[in-house]
Amino acid sequence: MKKKKLKTILLALPLLVLLGGAYFPEPAEAAEPWPPRDNFFWLGQINKASDIINTDENLLTKEEGRRFAAAIQKVLDAGSQKGAERPSVVITFEPFLIKAGGPDITKIHAGRSSQDMLTTVSILRQREQLLQLSAALNQMTETLLNLAAAHEGTLIPNYTNGVQAQPNSLGHFLLAYVDAYERDQERIKEYYKRLNRSPMGATVLNGTGWPLNRDRMAAYLGFDGIAYNTYDAGQVFPQEAPIEMGAIASSIAIHNTSLIQEIMQQYAQPRPWILLREGNGNTYVSSAMPQKRNPGILNRCRTDSSTLLGLAVGEAFRAHNIPAGMADGRIRGNDDIVKDTTNVVNQMNRILQALDIKPERALEELNLDWTCSQEIADVMMRKHNIPFRSGHHFASEIVTFARARNITPVDFTYAQAQEVYRKVAAVDASLPKELPLTPEELKDAKDPAGIIRNRAVKGGPQHNEMQIMFANARNVLNANITWQKNAENKVKNAEIKLNNDFIRLLR
């Protein structure tokens, strides 16, 4: 009995390994640290800053400032207990302050409104998530760049209109996506400049009669400055921001799905040259078809990226056809799509780390079709002054001849080329009677590696240009990493200063 049970377990083990993580639950996401950095947290930070600034500016007495600080801290301490109520809007937060500090504490609300405060909270929360997205995108781009560098010499077929078109370096192909994702990072940086401006002091839309120090408030909250026009700050930009973020999310999602589909088409082949390593939740098996190793993380990332596109378009529809001042399309902080965007970026990073690339199989695939035919026409013109269209006609006839006989470029002989050429030359008086190409020239024109070597323009897959592009991409990536860290550090330092100054006020 024991032997039978052991045998059953051993037979099941390969299936469990293949299943990886597809039918088992994904690892649980790490619990958010407590207390969370939610609306309650940021309303607390705004109240701290208001109390400090208004005391310093003599809008509150020193005694009031200290007393109000104690009440604010009492509310924050109570809300930090597990299971405690953490009000998320101004009108439900304020009663807690009144209970802790009496009605006088509402003096800190002079010149403020739920509108500028909650807009500020939403921006602060999205800002934090945007910097996390930036870090994730940098990490994924670095993975992609390293993969491209490792496969500069891997020759692959590239496709246009779904048909094998030209040979290329896998490194060159991947560098194009590095450029694409670095443009996405540039969009994030540009959006961050517009996002990271403080609305505080706009009140509702026309400011306030209280001489609030908007610049100090902006500095305490880690902003780069103030959103100057108070109507724009409170009513126009909050509707515009989700649309711009939606455009960034859409661009990232489309780059994801494009790259995923380049990989997915290989899964239709019995012998792919690029696929996912099995196990670790990358693939999963079929319950009915033993041969299948379904590309689970590709499917999941594509689905989530496509869903993200729908959410991004939804941002525009929410803001469409409403006047400023309506809440329909406003920036919503934690409910915006930045987290979803970060999720698909992290998924793509995992995909790139899981790729199993077979250079020999890629070259075999390349040599099964006539992607070299344009090079034959090019060499005819470059070396023998044959008009391109005449050379193109000759190369096209080679393809027709070879495909009819199931001949690949590797097996196509010089004698067969001469045979095709004579038929073409017989009806084209502008052509020499004999094939001007030498056997060596024809062989080199059919060689994918030779085609890559012979590229002569800036930005091509030839080695010298690849080194330039690798260096440029690395420089851009390093600059993006530095920008993200600097932005994050500025926010952290502002928060440290605010908390330290508030502690001093408490004393």
Question: Model-flagged regions — what are they?
Answer:
Residues 122-127, 131-138, 142, 149, ...:
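Charged, flexible cofactor/metal-binding loops and thiol motifs
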